[in-house]
Amino acid sequence: MNTQILVFIACVLIEAKGDKICLGHHAVANGTKVNTLTERGIEVVNATETVETANIGKICTQGKRPTDLGQCGLLGTLIGPPQCDQFLEFESNLIIERREGNDVCYPGKFTNEESLRQILRGSGGVDKESMGFTYSGIRTNGTTSACRRSGSSFYAEMKWLLSNSDNAAFPQMTKSYRNPRNKPALIVWGIHHSGSTTEQTRLYGSGNKLITVGSSKYQQSFTPSPGARPQVNGQSGRIDFHWLLLDPNDTVTFTFNGAFIAPNRASFFRGESLGVQSDVPLDSNCGGDCFHSGGTIVSSLPFQNINSRTVGKCPRYVKQPSLLLATGMRNVPENPKTRGLFGAIAGFIENGWEGLIDGWYGFRHQNAQGEGTAADYKSTQSAIDQITGKLNRLIDKTNQQFELIDNEFNEIEQQIGNVINWTRDSMTEVWSYNAELLVAMENQHTIDLADSEMNKLYERVRKQLRENAEEDGTGCFEIFHKCDDQCMESIRNNTYDHTQYRAKSLQNRIQIDPVKLSSGYKDIILWFSFGASCFLLLAIAMGLVFICIKNGNMRCTICI
């Protein structure tokens, strides 16, 4: 009896599609690179620029009361040269000084010029009050061709006191003024330095001249210095202007015997203002609170890279043209090669979902009813709440209203100017470093926070499912019971009741091999098992054939 044994070997791989829920985070195809304390060039989903580089090349005056001084210098509003006649009294919250502006007509200068200029820039304008000085036995109408109106004139707010006639003696005089208001009075007077001793004698008589000024806080004596000097505006003489702030109810007393330029009115400040030196035009159709010589900076950002010398409520100047603040989580673009079932991610921190546009974190699920994706608003909102206001916090730390002293120093003040310039440069260096450090710290916090919220969401789902599901190491959970859309929704909104499905899950869990391997090892083991199984079956078949031939139950005929 011939017995023929036919052996068929078939290897079939069946993919069992069970219910599954996966967790993931938002990703974009091309993120933005930011720096943190520990790393540079980290890619994030969203980032906001913190350095303003856009400038409006005009002085924006919308909502302001600007005063454009034109040819009048700011200090000239106190003494009244012809070019300042329309600004002897004014009110403003934005004072614009022009390069063409001049403080004087008869050559001279102010002492502590920059300090006085800064005071006037913030004064809100000035109004004036007569000091009530009267004179007898002298002339009070001194004029000069350097200050021309219809003809020779003088400073509108000053009186040039001269001897009653050429070469006549100038009498010793004392004049006092008490400040009647409840705010400081600005008092300005001048000392005339004649072009020669002969000129001084002609104007004030012979003998030494001495001017003494005193108040409760101020005491100073002045002696004129006649002498030849280069002519300016046709004059070889000079007038030095001095000033003091007189407290309420305080009295200033002037004692003099010639060469004295007497004040006519005291000046009082009207309020507060900003002062900017600029030659750009004014524009009432735009508004802003930060000004510089080149125009207006309108920005809500904490830093700017436009001009280091600004006035008003301004972003801090930094050297860096860009400092990106992370306002989104770490970005890892979706990689199709690492997807599992229906595009599930392989490692929820290592890869993202580019389609999750309505939230930072979310779920994807698969069940008998199909597949779906939904954002998790709770974790998303938790992260956003902590990151919202990050830019505002930076602005609060950096934005202050301040004014920087300009570099218009005379020779005496040049050393002070050098110190201020060095200090300004040092401050820029410090703030540039501080800005980079602040942004890096905030970026570090944002990225750590985003990862933390992702982990919290993962732990929340794991604690809900407990033994009813098993993690597969890719950010997904294999669920051991049927989980319809309502069940999936309960997992997402944290109302899932694991006890309801415990019995069915335990029954299904017993049928599943508890050992889980990563996909790479699964492939190796699969092929190894397949080869070993085929070899074993082949060995068994050959053994049966050998036994049958030996017992005579099978005959092998070889034909050639």
Swiss-Prot record:
Membrane topology: Single-pass type I membrane protein
Keyword field: Clathrin- and caveolin-independent endocytosis of virus by host, Clathrin-mediated endocytosis of virus by host, Disulfide bond, Fusion of virus membrane with host endosomal membrane, Fusion of virus membrane with host membrane, Glycoprotein, Hemagglutinin, Host cell membrane, Host membrane, Host-virus interaction, Lipoprotein, Membrane, Palmitate, Signal, Transmembrane, Transmembrane helix, Viral attachment to host cell, Viral envelope protein, Viral penetration into host cytoplasm, Virion, Virus endocytosis by host, Virus entry into host cell
Substitution effect: K504E: In strain: SC35M mouse-adapted
Post-translational modification remark: Palmitoylated.
Cystine pairs: C22-C476, C60-C286, C72-C84, C105-C147, C290-C314, C483-C487
Keyword Signal attached: yes
Lipid sites, type S-palmitoyl cysteine: C556, C559
A Pfam family of this chain: Hemagglutinin
Subcellular location: Virion membrane; Host apical cell membrane
Signal peptide segment: 1-18
InterPro entries reported for this sequence: Capsid_hemagglutn, Hemagglutn_HA1_a/b_dom_sf, Hemagglutn_influenz_A, Hemagglutn_influenz_A/B
GO BP, sorted A to Z: clathrin-dependent endocytosis of virus by host cell; fusion of virus membrane with host endosome membrane; fusion of virus membrane with host plasma membrane; viral budding from plasma membrane; virion attachment to host cell
Membrane-spanning parts: 524-544
Residues that carry a glycan: N30, N46, N141, N249, N421, N493
Extracellular topological intervals: 19-523
Keyword Transmembrane helix applies: yes
Main location: virion
Single GO term (MF): host cell surface receptor binding
GO-annotated cellular components: host cell plasma membrane; membrane; viral envelope; virion membrane
Site (Cleavage): residue numbering on this chain: R339, G340
Quaternary structure and partners: Homotrimer of disulfide-linked HA1-HA2.
Role noted for this protein: Binds to sialic acid-containing receptors on the cell surface, bringing about the attachment of the virus particle to the cell. This attachment induces virion internalization either through clathrin-dependent endocytosis or through clathrin- and caveolin-independent pathway. Plays a major role in the determination of host range restriction and virulence. Class I viral fusion protein. Responsible for penetration of the virus into the cell cytoplasm by mediating the fusion of the membrane of the endocytosed virus particle with the endosomal membrane.
HAMAP family according to UniProt: INFV_HEMA
Misc. comment: Major glycoprotein, comprises over 80% of the envelope proteins present in virus particle.
Entry's family note: Belongs to the influenza viruses hemagglutinin family.
Protein name (database record): Hemagglutinin
Organism encoding this protein: Influenza A virus (strain A/Seal/Massachusetts/1/1980 H7N7)
